[in-house]
Amino acid sequence: MGASQSTSGIEGASSPEQLSVLLAERFATKCFTPLELTHFKDNFYSRALDQAGFRYWNEKILSDFLSVPDGIYTNEKDGGHDGRLDAGPVVFRMVSYLGAFPFQKTLAPSVLTFDSMVKVVVLLTERYGKVLRRGRKDRVKLLFGSLADVGRSLEQDTKKQNDSAESASKSEDSKQSSHVHGFSVDEPTNDDYEEHEDDDDLALAALESLDAIEVFKHDQQIDRAVCEARISIDTFRRLLMLLLAIAPLRPLESVNKYTFNLSSEEQAAVKREADTIIASFTEEEIRDGIGYKTFAKTVTLSLPHLFDPLTPLFEHLLFSENLDLSRKQTGQSEPSPESPPSEAPTDANIDEKPTTIMLPGSFESAILTPSMVSHLSFFLPASSGQNLYRSDIRLHPVFSTVAHGESLTSFQHNVFTWQAPSLLIVQGALPGSSGSPDELITLGAYIPQPWKPSSSSSYESPQNLNNRSRLPYLFQLHPKHSVLPGNSSLLQTKEQPSTTPIVYFSTTTGIAIGCEVPASAQQHRTSYGPGVPSPHQQPHRRQSSTNHKQQQGPLPHGAGSLIIDAALETAQLHISYLAAHTGVFTPAVPPTLPTITHIDIYNLEIWGIIEPPSLSLLPDSAGIAKDAISRQREAWQFDAREAERRKGINVKLGSGNDSNYQNAKALLEMAGIIGDQAQQRSGGSV
């Protein structure tokens, strides 16, 4: 493949095959640096099969290089355990489809030549923006087509595979590409999705860059009568398990430690998270396959970062160990092209511990597992606009009912001193259930602002943050995945109404997220959540009537609300599919949750979210930039000093004559330290 292509060559190209090669040329020169392209070529050609001068990869070479297990999937019913995620055939199907871009209908499945692999890497690492001005950053329709394997014409797939095989070696290609036969990788025709016209932007932009729109339109008109495509649950599950396992993968990090020799517990945890995502689809979709409209809506709204792990996975092609200068300096010789280097996992790579974003602290999580954190990374926002792992976010343990007890005083002491966004995770089961793992329900909420008493609910921030990271999220992880994104209208106002705060906290009623708080209830609260104005300081009497307290408690509002009682023993998730876009949250996606879920809480945890240093350092009163952990420790030290000071003052009150006692008492009452006014003070610090 040449380094460049002349304009006359582009004008002379008229067939999809010629235009496909020219697009690969343009991708290679515009989307990779010269060094990356050199490494890419070395990786490809040092491993490629050669049949009469035709160089290509088969499934085994691709799986071995990416360290994606390609063995026989071990079913639990068969007994035994091979520690593998059998995703190799699925990845190969995807790559064979994407290699034909933008002529998937006439050229897919494609043989994995260097030109095809160039397009695959550009598409999966989202580097196409350097060439395709009109290209959209979501690849949902393209990825759906690469996975669709239900509802296709077997005759067409067989013909396409035979045509592809003839262009290479009939004997070798048929032997090595057994998984490709019967793959349904042509373009889906689920044209009832609302945004189907916009979803062709990538392909249109690609052909527009080559002045070949008419050829593309001709290709799109071929075979409009093909059956509606669907993704089988088995295919989707295997891909999900791979994505969950490699979600923490960093650029050029060894993949082996995430995909090989998983323990039975680790593989079961990965499978459980995959099953909760699959359970969010309808019974018909689970039985007959997932259609494009449902797939696109679910991925776009509730799993926007699902395919992010594919980026660092395929970026491995852009670095060759054969060209590692440090190895050359030590005198190590390069493997010869006739003997392709083996990508078998080494013991050192397998034994190396996977990356974790959970920091050590006052407790170890009784809820979160590495697979669950991977699940969270598929939809939780970050200020960078990327997922949790790619944003270098860390989770700091702040509060746990297991470690700190179920006291709201302890909750205030640990949570209200955390001056950064946080993640609330609740795990429990339905009342009367046995509490087995299959019956556990896991709920959570992303709180974008610190828990603190405040006289303002402003969304103004000194940093230019990504909008999604400034919105709250309510979600359920188990037994069915579902997400309620924050209402974007929250970003359009500086003051959030005091009757509908994001979070409301009271020692009387507990914790309420996304609820409506009656004005009468605000007069009786003792603590306040983020963005909730403090009431006027007026003396009041506590209500003793239980019924009266219930009437003044937070009420479910909008599309979703979470209410946790003051004893941290029970939780209620309220879902409304008729509320449209009113309230703090937008409707649940997928819409599979019951309207009311009542659970007995087993564990409740708060995890602080620490952004990269450039974003998480905020100045203190002296103008010194400090992270959230340091500021929390300083708050605890201040509280401890205040407690000692007050203790000393109380001792002095006991001595002296009555006049001195009354004067000291009056002084403390005016300061709000003791007396009725002290009872009304918000509990931001304890």
Curated annotation (Swiss-Prot):
It is found in: Cytoplasm. The lineage of its organism: Eukaryota, Fungi, Dikarya, Ascomycota, Pezizomycotina. Belongs to the RTC5 family. The gene is rtc5. Residues 366-610 form the TLDc domain. PROSITE patterns: TLDC. Residues 188-198 have a biased composition (Acidic residues). One of its GO terms (cellular component) is cytoplasm. It comes from Talaromyces stipitatus (strain ATCC 10500 / CBS 375.48 / QM 6759 / NRRL 1006) (Penicillium stipitatum). May be involved in a process influencing telomere capping. Residues 544-553 have a biased composition (Polar residues). InterPro entries: TLDc_dom (IPR006571). Its main location: cytoplasm. Residues 155-198, 326-355, 522-559 are annotated as: Disordered. This is Restriction of telomere capping protein 5.
